[in-house]
Amino acid sequence: MNPFSSESAWLCLTATAVLGGMLLCKAWSSGQLRSQVVCLAGLWGGACLLSLSLLCSLFLLSVSCFFLLYVSSSDQDLLPVDQKAVLVTGADSGFGHALAKHLDKLGFTVFAGVLDKEGPGAEELRKNCSERLSVLQMDVTKPEQIKDVHSEVAEKIQDKGLWAVVNNAGVLHFPIDGELIPMTVYRKCMAVNFFGAVEVTKVFLPLLRKSKGRLVNVSSMGAMIPFQMVAAYASTKAAISMFSAVIRQELAKWGVKVVTIHPGGFQTNIVGSQDSWDKMEKEILDHFSKEIQENYGQEYVHTQKLALPVMREMSNPDITPVLRDIQHAICAKNPSSFYCSGRMTYLWICFAAYSPISLLDYILKNYFTPKLMPRALRTAS
């Protein structure tokens, strides 16, 4: 019997096509296309596995499209800026710098926390932004500076409350095997990327609770995917992602929404310059033991610097997707719990989560392994 001979089947097919088309168009315009497609593909695959009839499958998909369209529509409802105040950490450069300028143009009162108040990034913010933006000295590894910023912010906003905190400050390290990364680097990454964000969160939560606002933590796709050579960085980003997931539930009763941003590869200053990599290389070599020297060799470390131009070339120079997602997290009436910013980021994270570990390791090993092997392995071969 032809499955399309009944009027019910044609009705379900038409409803699925119309609702699905509307959903995909809306998802495309909002930048959330990947998640919607994966969701619908999963539903279709599940229907096939359950051996449902075509009519039942189409009915399931049409209902799902309607539900996702409803959720997608509600997610697009934006709250008025209305002089809301936002604190952004790590605003010297990169995402934080661009975000501070972007929010200022939208009409927010912006508190831009910078590592160096007299640096070029801070000076550019003062020069190019409105009087609504304040540049504040804020090294997130120094509790006294965090408290000073809190006092200044509380004094300026008075009874308005602080609408959002964006924990963006972060550091990367020289890309090398986890065994070779000095403990000082592990501690620095943890101090900035995790403990700094946690302390900022704890200090400013009373202000967020007052406004029932937003806490936005910038993590990384590296928190979800075990890329080689970034053991210290990825571990800290995984920590902030889990911290965000836990306090998202804890703060819900206070009306505070917690959002995690997982950017893919973008060109920012976090990658560092040739000079900074030279210093990091020297630090690694200074910590070499005799056994490490025999097994790896200095040339193995030196060749990792060749990855710098490759990393930049593979990264997206347009950080608009990240700014768009953070803006949505701050402004949307019903923001998502997490955003995956960038090309293929969501699909990569889904693949890492659901593929067999052996397959994931094989792909990562073959596509992200240094060309030069350690000295001992080269000698053995």
Swiss-Prot record:
Cross-referenced InterPro entries: NAD(P)-bd_dom_sf (IPR036291), Sc_DH/Rdtase_CS (IPR020904), SDR_fam (IPR002347)
Topology in membrane: Single-pass type II membrane protein
Superkingdom to which the source organism belongs: Eukaryota
UniProt note on tissues of expression: Highly expressed in the placenta, and in the small intestine, and liver.
Enzyme class, first EC level, given as a word: oxidoreductase
Example GO BP: steroid metabolic process
Family: Belongs to the short-chain dehydrogenases/reductases (SDR) family.
Name under which the protein is recorded: Estradiol 17-beta-dehydrogenase 2
